[in-house]
Swiss-Prot record:
The protein's name: UPF0397 protein LACR_0367
Family per record: Belongs to the UPF0397 family.
UniProt-annotated location(s): Cell membrane
Pfam families assigned to the protein according to its UniProt record, in alphabetical order: ECF-ribofla_trS
Gene3D superfamilies: 1.10.1760.20
Keywords, comma-separated and alphabetical: Cell membrane, Membrane, Transmembrane, Transmembrane helix
Length: 188
Protein backbone atom coordinates (compact mmCIF):
# COMPACT_ATOMS: atom_id res chain seq x y z
CA UNK A 1 0.00 0.00 0.00
CA UNK A 2 1.24 3.49 -0.80
CA UNK A 3 1.99 5.76 2.17
CA UNK A 4 -0.54 8.41 1.04
CA UNK A 5 -3.29 5.79 0.89
CA UNK A 6 -2.50 4.69 4.45
CA UNK A 7 -2.77 8.27 5.71
CA UNK A 8 -6.05 8.73 3.82
CA UNK A 9 -7.46 5.46 5.22
CA UNK A 10 -6.45 6.43 8.75
CA UNK A 11 -8.03 9.87 8.31
CA UNK A 12 -11.29 8.30 7.17
CA UNK A 13 -11.22 5.90 10.14
CA UNK A 14 -10.65 8.78 12.55
CA UNK A 15 -13.51 10.81 11.05
CA UNK A 16 -15.92 7.85 11.16
CA UNK A 17 -14.81 6.88 14.69
CA UNK A 18 -15.23 10.50 15.80
CA UNK A 19 -18.78 10.66 14.45
CA UNK A 20 -19.86 7.36 15.96
CA UNK A 21 -17.99 7.94 19.22
CA UNK A 22 -19.36 11.47 19.69
CA UNK A 23 -22.90 10.22 19.00
CA UNK A 24 -22.49 7.44 21.58
CA UNK A 25 -21.01 9.95 24.05
CA UNK A 26 -24.11 12.14 23.70
CA UNK A 27 -26.64 9.29 23.83
CA UNK A 28 -25.06 7.47 26.77
CA UNK A 29 -24.50 10.76 28.62
CA UNK A 30 -28.14 11.67 28.10
CA UNK A 31 -29.64 8.28 28.99
CA UNK A 32 -27.32 7.20 31.82
CA UNK A 33 -26.60 10.08 34.15
CA UNK A 34 -26.43 9.01 37.81
CA UNK A 35 -26.31 12.04 40.15
CA UNK A 36 -23.83 12.32 43.04
CA UNK A 37 -24.45 14.37 46.21
CA UNK A 38 -22.31 17.15 44.69
CA UNK A 39 -24.33 19.53 42.43
CA UNK A 40 -23.67 19.31 38.66
CA UNK A 41 -21.59 16.17 39.14
CA UNK A 42 -22.69 12.68 38.13
CA UNK A 43 -21.52 9.19 37.30
CA UNK A 44 -21.30 9.07 33.51
CA UNK A 45 -20.73 5.81 31.66
CA UNK A 46 -19.84 7.50 28.38
CA UNK A 47 -16.26 7.78 29.66
CA UNK A 48 -15.93 3.99 29.46
CA UNK A 49 -16.91 4.16 25.78
CA UNK A 50 -14.51 7.08 25.31
CA UNK A 51 -11.77 4.83 26.72
CA UNK A 52 -12.58 2.08 24.20
CA UNK A 53 -12.68 4.41 21.19
CA UNK A 54 -9.53 6.25 22.30
CA UNK A 55 -7.70 2.93 22.66
CA UNK A 56 -8.86 1.68 19.26
CA UNK A 57 -8.47 4.86 17.19
CA UNK A 58 -5.82 6.82 19.04
CA UNK A 59 -5.39 10.06 20.95
CA UNK A 60 -6.61 12.39 18.17
CA UNK A 61 -9.87 10.50 17.75
CA UNK A 62 -10.19 10.33 21.54
CA UNK A 63 -9.79 14.09 21.86
CA UNK A 64 -12.31 14.81 19.10
CA UNK A 65 -14.85 12.32 20.47
CA UNK A 66 -14.63 13.72 23.99
CA UNK A 67 -14.65 17.37 22.87
CA UNK A 68 -17.41 17.14 20.25
CA UNK A 69 -19.48 14.65 22.24
CA UNK A 70 -19.40 16.74 25.41
CA UNK A 71 -20.11 20.00 23.53
CA UNK A 72 -23.15 18.44 21.84
CA UNK A 73 -24.37 16.80 25.05
CA UNK A 74 -24.19 20.09 26.95
CA UNK A 75 -25.89 21.93 24.08
CA UNK A 76 -28.76 19.45 23.93
CA UNK A 77 -29.23 19.02 27.68
CA UNK A 78 -28.40 22.49 29.03
CA UNK A 79 -28.68 24.85 26.07
CA UNK A 80 -24.97 25.72 25.90
CA UNK A 81 -21.62 23.98 26.39
CA UNK A 82 -19.59 24.51 29.55
CA UNK A 83 -16.33 24.90 27.61
CA UNK A 84 -13.85 24.22 30.39
CA UNK A 85 -15.35 20.78 30.99
CA UNK A 86 -15.80 20.18 27.27
CA UNK A 87 -12.04 20.71 26.93
CA UNK A 88 -11.59 18.34 29.87
CA UNK A 89 -13.47 15.56 28.09
CA UNK A 90 -11.36 16.13 24.99
CA UNK A 91 -8.18 15.93 27.04
CA UNK A 92 -9.43 12.75 28.72
CA UNK A 93 -9.89 11.17 25.29
CA UNK A 94 -6.41 12.32 24.28
CA UNK A 95 -4.77 10.86 27.40
CA UNK A 96 -6.81 7.64 27.24
CA UNK A 97 -5.51 7.17 23.69
CA UNK A 98 -2.00 6.93 25.13
CA UNK A 99 -3.04 4.44 27.83
CA UNK A 100 -3.26 1.37 25.61
CA UNK A 101 -0.94 -0.04 22.96
CA UNK A 102 -3.35 -0.32 20.02
CA UNK A 103 -1.31 -2.97 18.23
CA UNK A 104 -1.43 -5.27 21.26
CA UNK A 105 -5.14 -4.67 21.84
CA UNK A 106 -6.04 -5.43 18.22
CA UNK A 107 -4.00 -8.64 18.48
CA UNK A 108 -6.07 -9.73 21.47
CA UNK A 109 -3.51 -8.83 24.11
CA UNK A 110 -4.95 -7.06 27.15
CA UNK A 111 -3.67 -8.91 30.19
CA UNK A 112 -2.76 -7.80 33.70
CA UNK A 113 0.23 -5.71 32.59
CA UNK A 114 -1.89 -3.82 30.03
CA UNK A 115 -4.76 -3.38 32.50
CA UNK A 116 -2.41 -1.91 35.12
CA UNK A 117 -0.79 0.44 32.58
CA UNK A 118 -4.19 1.57 31.27
CA UNK A 119 -5.54 2.23 34.75
CA UNK A 120 -2.46 4.15 35.89
CA UNK A 121 -2.76 6.40 32.82
CA UNK A 122 -6.51 6.91 33.19
CA UNK A 123 -6.25 7.61 36.93
CA UNK A 124 -3.50 10.21 36.42
CA UNK A 125 -5.46 11.75 33.53
CA UNK A 126 -8.58 12.03 35.72
CA UNK A 127 -6.59 13.69 38.51
CA UNK A 128 -4.98 16.22 36.16
CA UNK A 129 -8.04 16.95 33.99
CA UNK A 130 -10.84 17.04 36.56
CA UNK A 131 -8.79 17.89 39.65
CA UNK A 132 -6.77 20.72 38.09
CA UNK A 133 -7.47 21.80 34.51
CA UNK A 134 -11.29 21.97 34.58
CA UNK A 135 -11.55 23.72 37.98
CA UNK A 136 -8.80 26.23 37.17
CA UNK A 137 -10.54 26.88 33.84
CA UNK A 138 -13.84 27.43 35.67
CA UNK A 139 -12.18 29.99 37.95
CA UNK A 140 -10.43 31.82 35.10
CA UNK A 141 -13.18 31.68 32.45
CA UNK A 142 -16.40 31.66 34.46
CA UNK A 143 -15.26 33.30 37.74
CA UNK A 144 -16.61 30.33 39.69
CA UNK A 145 -15.76 29.97 43.41
CA UNK A 146 -12.65 27.83 43.90
CA UNK A 147 -14.03 25.63 46.69
CA UNK A 148 -17.09 24.74 44.58
CA UNK A 149 -15.25 23.85 41.37
CA UNK A 150 -12.42 21.95 43.06
CA UNK A 151 -14.99 19.89 44.99
CA UNK A 152 -16.86 19.16 41.75
CA UNK A 153 -13.59 18.37 39.98
CA UNK A 154 -12.32 15.97 42.64
CA UNK A 155 -15.66 14.13 42.80
CA UNK A 156 -15.93 13.98 38.98
CA UNK A 157 -12.34 12.73 38.74
CA UNK A 158 -12.92 9.99 41.30
CA UNK A 159 -16.21 8.74 39.86
CA UNK A 160 -14.85 8.91 36.30
CA UNK A 161 -11.71 7.03 37.36
CA UNK A 162 -13.85 4.35 39.00
CA UNK A 163 -16.19 4.17 35.99
CA UNK A 164 -13.29 3.81 33.57
CA UNK A 165 -11.47 1.34 35.85
CA UNK A 166 -14.50 -0.95 35.93
CA UNK A 167 -16.52 -0.42 32.74
CA UNK A 168 -13.66 0.85 30.54
CA UNK A 169 -11.38 -2.02 31.51
CA UNK A 170 -14.23 -4.48 30.95
CA UNK A 171 -14.94 -3.08 27.45
CA UNK A 172 -11.25 -3.28 26.53
CA UNK A 173 -10.95 -6.82 27.92
CA UNK A 174 -14.07 -7.92 26.02
CA UNK A 175 -12.79 -6.32 22.81
CA UNK A 176 -9.40 -8.03 23.16
CA UNK A 177 -11.16 -11.37 23.71
CA UNK A 178 -12.82 -11.03 20.27
CA UNK A 179 -9.43 -10.66 18.53
CA UNK A 180 -7.40 -13.62 17.35
CA UNK A 181 -4.02 -13.69 19.03
CA UNK A 182 -1.05 -13.86 16.69
CA UNK A 183 0.14 -17.44 16.20
CA UNK A 184 -2.97 -19.10 17.66
CA UNK A 185 -4.30 -20.45 14.38
CA UNK A 186 -2.79 -23.67 13.07
CA UNK A 187 -2.74 -24.90 9.49
CA UNK A 188 -4.41 -28.25 9.02
Amino acid sequence: MIKGETIKNNSVKIVVATGIGAALFVIIGWLINIPTPIPNTSIQLQYAVLALFSALFGPLAGFLIGFIGHALKDSFLYGAPWWTWVLGSGLMGLFLGFGVKRESLTQGIFGNKEIIRFNIVQFLANVVVWGLIAPIGDILVYSEPANKVFTQGVVAGLVNALTIAVAGTLLLKLYAATRTKSGTLDKE
